[in-house]
């Protein structure tokens, strides 16, 4: 637009009629806020990706995620920079307006000049107002030139400030064929576990055996066959998992429990004396055989007791009781109560000391620490209450110390 052909009334009127620089400053603040949010989002993405791929996540899925999200993070950073630049240019446009506004002649001054000219012309009967009319016209010409210069400068500054870099749309980070690819990956991932699952029953059968060497050999062979077929990414995933502290602690606890069940006590341990660390472990499914008590109808062949595991004599029919029998009016009396006939026989189950392992006394347990469990617990009688032998004490007893000699 050629602002030189427009009178000062139009140029000054346009400059003073607008809303001013307020909208441009508000736009600059909005662009700055958008730039800050985009920058924070890009930084959060970078931090999350670095933490995931740096210590906890590796493999094809991690690589695919990084490849998909990297363009998006770059777009966020570039858009944040463009938004910040837009805010700066909005401030530049506001500054250009303020400068042009200061250079523009106020409309009241222009109106006063025109009113003075009309008055001088109206009273110029004998030519006495000719010099004043010329001066008034000269002032008006200066106003014209000043407004035109201000508008030309403002137009140039505004054109530079409004030259923004075009914004681009966010990149597409998903694949249209992702669902089909995921279905194919699911089908392919179910094939290898079928072969692995087929070996589980065999391993469980070997685990139920008391022999450790075949079980260890089979487990070692199974691990070798399966681990050697892993891809480098899968091996890297296993290595990363083994590097996590809580994963190692969990494996250590699992191995310790297996060792506690697999390793019996020392054959020559003192049992309840606790002279050996291994004496505190056992009994397990791998515990050696021991002699079971003689059972009616079996257990001893030719006067020699047959070695049986611990659980055999724990399920002794004689200890548990015979067949079920009942009769009417045959109950025994315990004071004013009627009790079953075998009440006295069953009372031995209430006293742990009355039901003992093979042998006549507690010393029969000594020397068998290789298959004992938590030896050394004292046996307490359950036939009588010992609560009356204790006296309840409340509060606390104060200890009074004498004044030491060095205290004076």
Swiss-Prot record:
Residues annotated as transmembrane: 56-76
Record key words, sorted: Cell membrane, Membrane, Transmembrane, Transmembrane helix
Membrane topology: Single-pass membrane protein
Intrachain S-S bonds: none
Chief localization: membrane
Gene Ontology CC: plasma membrane
GO terms, biological process: response to host immune response
Subcellular localization(s) per the UniProt record: Cell membrane
Family indicated by similarity: Belongs to the mycobacterial PPE family.
PANTHER family the record matches: GLUTAMINE-RICH PROTEIN 2
Protein name: Uncharacterized PPE family protein PPE45
Gene behind the chain: PPE45
């Amino acid at each position: 637009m050629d602002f030189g052909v427009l009178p000062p009334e139009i140029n000054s009127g346009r400059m003073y009629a607008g809303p001013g620089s307020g909208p441009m400053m508000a736009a600059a603040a909005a662009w700055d806020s958008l730039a800050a949010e985009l920058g924070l989002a890009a930084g959060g993405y970078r931090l999350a990706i670095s933490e995931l791929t740096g210590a906890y996540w590796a493999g094809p899925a991690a690589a695919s995620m990084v490849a998909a999200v990297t363009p998006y993070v770059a777009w966020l950073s570039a858009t944040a920079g463009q938004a910040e630049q837009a805010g700066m240019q909005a401030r530049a446009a506001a500054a250009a307006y303020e400068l042009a506004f200061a250079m523009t002649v106020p409309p009241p001054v222009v109106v006063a000049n025109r009113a003075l000219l009309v008055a001088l012309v109206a009273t110029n009967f004998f030519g006495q107002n000719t010099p004043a009319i010329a001066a008034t016209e000269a002032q008006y010409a200066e106003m014209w030139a000043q407004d035109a210069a201000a508008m030309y400068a403002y137009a140039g500054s505004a054109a530079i400030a409004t030259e923004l870099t075009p914004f681009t749309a966010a990149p597409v980070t998903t694949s249209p064929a992702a669902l089909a690819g995921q279905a194919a990956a699911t089908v392919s991932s179910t094939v290898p576990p079928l072969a692995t699952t087929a070996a589980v029953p065999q391993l469980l059968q070997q685990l139920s055996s008391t022999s450790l060497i075949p079980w260890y050999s089979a487990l070692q062979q199974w691990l070798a066959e399966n681990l050697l077929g892993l891809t480098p990414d899968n091996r890297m995933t296993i290595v990363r998992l083994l590097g996590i502290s809580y994963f190692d602690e969990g494996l250590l606890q699992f191995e310790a429990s297996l060792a506690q069940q697999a390793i019996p006590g020392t054959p020559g341990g003192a049992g309840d004396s606790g002279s050996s660390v291994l004496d505190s472990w056992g009994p397990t499914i791998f515990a050696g055989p021991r002699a079971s008590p003689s059972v009616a109808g079996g257990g001893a062949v030719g006067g020699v007791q047959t070695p049986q595991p611990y659980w055999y004599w724990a399920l002794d029919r004689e200890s548990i009781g015979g067949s079920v029998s009942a009769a009417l009016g045959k109950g025994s009396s315990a004071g004013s109560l009627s009790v079953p006939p075998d009440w006295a026989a069953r009372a031995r189950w209430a006293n742990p000391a009355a039901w003992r392992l093979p042998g006549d006394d507690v010393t029969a347990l000594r020397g068998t620490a290789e298959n004992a469990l938590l030896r050394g617990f004292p046996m307490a009688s359950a036939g009588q209450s010992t609560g009356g032998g204790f006296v309840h004490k409340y509060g606390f007893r104060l200890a009074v110390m004498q004044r030491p000699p060095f205290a004076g």
